[in-house]
Amino acid sequence: MHPMNRYEVALVTGASSGIGKAIALELASAGLRVLALGRDRAALDELHSTAGIVPVVFDLSDVSEVYGKIAGEKIDVLVNNAGLLTASASLVDLSEDDIDAMIDINIRSVFKLTRHVLKQMIERRRGHIFFTGSSGGLAPHPNSSVYGATKAAVSLFSSALRCDLIGLPIRVTELFPGRVETNLYRTALGKEGAKKKLYDDNEAIQPEHMARLLRTALELPDFVDVTRLEVMPTGQVVGGAQMSKLSR
């Protein structure tokens, strides 16, 4: 059976803006009932009014609290998209709170929410789990040690999860976007800082591009699992960050 004929409910985290918002809209247009989880109530309410998407206002820093909000939902598609880059800084310039926050959102919440939803997917013998990774988890970049490490952890987790699920009709896909125009970098670098460093004179992937690719992977037959989707602007190369040795 074509998976889109039996997938009914999707949960998308980090859906207030950027890639998560675009994915929520794309899945709603495909006919799924979409639960959009995020912190921005106004943004989620707008998704509800424009596309009938169900808002779930929540901060994933304590993911166990979200279980009650999705109780009774038979989730067929889980999109672990929420991510946090607190600052673009070297390790010694990050606070311990910065480190804890990135680990909480980028790793702990992903592992726990996936475990929770996966139990019901196994019982119903159907489902597709997506992870939004990052090119920052594929190669080292300056001022990105903790963020890159969290994304590398999710990448290995995604691959290992496929091993756990071998023999079950549940698919796992990781998205690897390169330079994409979202609030993630605006939060870390500031609006003008992100514009100058990343977007001026550079073409960037748009969130809608990632959403379309996710839908393509989702719509393939059950026996076809796109395990990784690595997407870069044509002018970007992973590991191409320029670094210079500084005297101390």
From Swiss-Prot:
Entry's family note: Belongs to the short-chain dehydrogenases/reductases (SDR) family.
This protein's UniProt keywords: Oxidoreductase, Plasmid
Active site: Y147
Positions that bind substrate: S134
InterPro entries: NAD(P)-bd_dom_sf, Sc_DH/Rdtase_CS, SDR_fam
Residues bound to NADP(+): 8-32
The name this protein goes by in its record: Uncharacterized short-chain type dehydrogenase/reductase y4eK
Molecular function GO labels: oxidoreductase activity
Family matches, as Pfam families: adh_short (PF00106)
EC number, UniProt record: 1.-.-.-
UniProt-listed SUPFAM superfamilies: NAD(P)-binding Rossmann-fold domains
